[in-house]
């Protein structure tokens, strides 16, 4: 139960940060030429899978309030799929940064194509790709690595989807006296994490 609460809370926090950044930087966060700083958060699934829900919700709300319905559809899909692929590629050496670059560059320009704009798709592809390289690689990547190291040193717990979804069953067993809750609720750090779970943060 505690893990599930943490999981949901962190998702909400990530969504709020994404929306706040998009709101504060609204003039440069939307349109064919954009610099959406909040997209740097899409790398968080590398060590925080709950942020997949957070960045997707944050992107949806940002596009819903400040952009067109086409952006709500294509932009949110691009961010959601990119976040999932980033999580799946979390064990690779920086390859997890590729999905946000490619998916946003491929899907976001479709907004203006479907909207009837005469803007060239390839031109928008290049512009979005360039902005994603700056936001994701030059800003998001170092921030993500630094944040992960800082949270690990602080003893902040990281959970996989499997662990978060299993939390209700663990809580039920604890209340029945069938499981010891000390190890379940113990903060996970690099020093005390079980060997089998260390790979989830690699």
Where are these regions (language model features)?
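Hydrophobic transmembrane alpha-helices
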Residues: 1-53
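Membrane-embedded alpha-helical hairpins and interfacial helices in multi-pass inner-membrane proteins
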Residues: 27-32, 60-188, 199-200
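Small-polar-interrupted transmembrane alpha-helices in polytopic inner-membrane proteins
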Residues: 18, 55-63
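Juxtamembrane loop-helix boundary motifs flanking transmembrane segments in multi-pass membrane proteins
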Residues: 1-4, 56, 118, 122
């Amino acid at each position: 139960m505690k893990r599930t609460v943490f999981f949901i809370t962190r998702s909400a926090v990530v969504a709020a940060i994404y929306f706040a950044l998009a709101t504060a930087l609204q003039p440069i966060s939307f349109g064919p030429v954009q610099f959406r700083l909040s997209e740097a958060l899409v790398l968080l699934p590398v060590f925080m899978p709950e942020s997949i829900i957070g960045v997707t919700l944050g992107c949806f709300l940002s596009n819903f309030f400040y952009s067109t319905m086409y952006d709500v559809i294509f932009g949110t899909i691009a961010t959601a799929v990119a976040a999932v692929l980033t999580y799946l590629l979390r064990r690779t050496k920086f390859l997890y940064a590729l999905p946000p670059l490619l998916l946003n560059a491929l899907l976001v320009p479709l907004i203006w194509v479907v909207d009837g704009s005469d803007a060239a798709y390839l031109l928008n592809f290049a512009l979005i790709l360039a902005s994603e390289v700056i936001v994701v690689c030059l800003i998001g990547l170092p921030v993500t690595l630094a944040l992960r190291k800082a949270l690990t040193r602080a003893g902040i717990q990281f959970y996989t989807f499997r662990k978060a979804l299993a939390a209700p069953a663990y809580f039920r067993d604890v209340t029945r006296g069938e499981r010891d809750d000390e190890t379940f609720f113990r903060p996970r750090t690099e020093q005390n994490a079980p060997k089998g779970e260390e790979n989830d943060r690699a």
